UniProtKB/Swiss-Prot annotation:
PANTHER family: GLUTAMINE-RICH PROTEIN 2 (PTHR46766:SF1). GO terms for biological process: response to host immune response. InterPro entries: PPE_C, PPE_dom, PPE_sf. The gene is PPE45. SUPFAM superfamilies: PE/PPE dimer-like. This is Uncharacterized PPE family protein PPE45.
Length: 408
């Protein structure tokens, strides 16, 4: 637009009629806020990706995620920079307006000049107002030139400030064929576990055996066959998992429990004396055989007791009781109560000391620490209450110390 052909009334009127620089400053603040949010989002993405791929996540899925999200993070950073630049240019446009506004002649001054000219012309009967009319016209010409210069400068500054870099749309980070690819990956991932699952029953059968060497050999062979077929990414995933502290602690606890069940006590341990660390472990499914008590109808062949595991004599029919029998009016009396006939026989189950392992006394347990469990617990009688032998004490007893000699 050629602002030189427009009178000062139009140029000054346009400059003073607008809303001013307020909208441009508000736009600059909005662009700055958008730039800050985009920058924070890009930084959060970078931090999350670095933490995931740096210590906890590796493999094809991690690589695919990084490849998909990297363009998006770059777009966020570039858009944040463009938004910040837009805010700066909005401030530049506001500054250009303020400068042009200061250079523009106020409309009241222009109106006063025109009113003075009309008055001088109206009273110029004998030519006495000719010099004043010329001066008034000269002032008006200066106003014209000043407004035109201000508008030309403002137009140039505004054109530079409004030259923004075009914004681009966010990149597409998903694949249209992702669902089909995921279905194919699911089908392919179910094939290898079928072969692995087929070996589980065999391993469980070997685990139920008391022999450790075949079980260890089979487990070692199974691990070798399966681990050697892993891809480098899968091996890297296993290595990363083994590097996590809580994963190692969990494996250590699992191995310790297996060792506690697999390793019996020392054959020559003192049992309840606790002279050996291994004496505190056992009994397990791998515990050696021991002699079971003689059972009616079996257990001893030719006067020699047959070695049986611990659980055999724990399920002794004689200890548990015979067949079920009942009769009417045959109950025994315990004071004013009627009790079953075998009440006295069953009372031995209430006293742990009355039901003992093979042998006549507690010393029969000594020397068998290789298959004992938590030896050394004292046996307490359950036939009588010992609560009356204790006296309840409340509060606390104060200890009074004498004044030491060095205290004076």
């Amino acid at each position: 637009m050629d602002f030189g052909v427009l009178p000062p009334e139009i140029n000054s009127g346009r400059m003073y009629a607008g809303p001013g620089s307020g909208p441009m400053m508000a736009a600059a603040a909005a662009w700055d806020s958008l730039a800050a949010e985009l920058g924070l989002a890009a930084g959060g993405y970078r931090l999350a990706i670095s933490e995931l791929t740096g210590a906890y996540w590796a493999g094809p899925a991690a690589a695919s995620m990084v490849a998909a999200v990297t363009p998006y993070v770059a777009w966020l950073s570039a858009t944040a920079g463009q938004a910040e630049q837009a805010g700066m240019q909005a401030r530049a446009a506001a500054a250009a307006y303020e400068l042009a506004f200061a250079m523009t002649v106020p409309p009241p001054v222009v109106v006063a000049n025109r009113a003075l000219l009309v008055a001088l012309v109206a009273t110029n009967f004998f030519g006495q107002n000719t010099p004043a009319i010329a001066a008034t016209e000269a002032q008006y010409a200066e106003m014209w030139a000043q407004d035109a210069a201000a508008m030309y400068a403002y137009a140039g500054s505004a054109a530079i400030a409004t030259e923004l870099t075009p914004f681009t749309a966010a990149p597409v980070t998903t694949s249209p064929a992702a669902l089909a690819g995921q279905a194919a990956a699911t089908v392919s991932s179910t094939v290898p576990p079928l072969a692995t699952t087929a070996a589980v029953p065999q391993l469980l059968q070997q685990l139920s055996s008391t022999s450790l060497i075949p079980w260890y050999s089979a487990l070692q062979q199974w691990l070798a066959e399966n681990l050697l077929g892993l891809t480098p990414d899968n091996r890297m995933t296993i290595v990363r998992l083994l590097g996590i502290s809580y994963f190692d602690e969990g494996l250590l606890q699992f191995e310790a429990s297996l060792a506690q069940q697999a390793i019996p006590g020392t054959p020559g341990g003192a049992g309840d004396s606790g002279s050996s660390v291994l004496d505190s472990w056992g009994p397990t499914i791998f515990a050696g055989p021991r002699a079971s008590p003689s059972v009616a109808g079996g257990g001893a062949v030719g006067g020699v007791q047959t070695p049986q595991p611990y659980w055999y004599w724990a399920l002794d029919r004689e200890s548990i009781g015979g067949s079920v029998s009942a009769a009417l009016g045959k109950g025994s009396s315990a004071g004013s109560l009627s009790v079953p006939p075998d009440w006295a026989a069953r009372a031995r189950w209430a006293n742990p000391a009355a039901w003992r392992l093979p042998g006549d006394d507690v010393t029969a347990l000594r020397g068998t620490a290789e298959n004992a469990l938590l030896r050394g617990f004292p046996m307490a009688s359950a036939g009588q209450s010992t609560g009356g032998g204790f006296v309840h004490k409340y509060g606390f007893r104060l200890a009074v110390m004498q004044r030491p000699p060095f205290a004076g």
